[in-house]
């Protein structure tokens, strides 16, 4: 059983609307996300439909993961979808999320979902083949195949900037989330989402990406 956590609604909405007259950045994000979410889901629906698969949209805020009725309702939702063979596609409900209580990024959301459904593994897809000891393009840089939660690998992180509408997470965030999730006995991987068959290779136990364990 698989759950896909995907961002992209804000940038999808920005591509549709272009420049808007809304000065407040938070309100712009809400508008971009509200416009872009159905566009993104239409794209996913078409892809899954081509393979004879069904998918569903599951939007969440941090409140949904707090102990209580909201969390129980979220668990019921995921369990029901998965029992029917439907692939849940999770994303933060950016249109209604309060800025001060937003997820740091979708990596955090993915970690919370993994814990919620008691996942066997969490695969975080990036644009690099995993965590390196330096810049991935440097000849002297080496990929770390396996990392434990007590290793100081944060020192290898390179800074990177992101524009408006793009995802909030970088490698530093991914390491933090990967370690935190692995500490809960959920094996976590950071791998290249552009690599062919990357998920299948990880599931098959091939040395793909960087594996985080407790």
Predicted regions and their residues:
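C-terminal catalytic "cap/lid" subdomain
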Residues: 1-214
């Amino acid at each position: 059983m698989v759950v896909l956590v995907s961002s992209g609604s804000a940038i999808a909405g920005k591509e549709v609307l272009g420049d808007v007259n809304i000065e407040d950045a938070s309100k712009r994000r809400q508008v971009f996300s509200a416009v872009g979410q159905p566009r993104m889901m239409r794209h996913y629906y078409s892809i899954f439909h081509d393979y004879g698969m069904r998918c569903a949209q599951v939007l969440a805020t941090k409140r949904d993961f707090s102990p209580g009725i909201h969390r129980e309702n979220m668990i019921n939702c995921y369990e029901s979808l998965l029992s029917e063979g439907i692939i849940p596609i999770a994303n933060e409900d950016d249109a209604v999320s309060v800025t001060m209580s937003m997820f740091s990024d979708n990596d955090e959301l993915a970690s919370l979902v993994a814990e919620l459904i008691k996942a066997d593994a969490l695969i975080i897809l990036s644009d690099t083949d995993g965590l390196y000891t330096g810049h991935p393009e440097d000849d002297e840089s080496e990929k770390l195949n396996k990392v434990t939660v007590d290793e100081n690998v944060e020192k290898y992180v390179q800074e990177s900037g992101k524009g408006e509408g793009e995802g909030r997470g970088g490698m530093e965030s991914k390491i933090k989330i990967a370690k935190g999730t692995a500490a809960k006995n959920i094996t976590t991987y950071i791998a290249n989402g552009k690599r062919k068959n990357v998920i299948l290779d990880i599931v098959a136990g091939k040395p793909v990406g960087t594996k985080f364990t407790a």
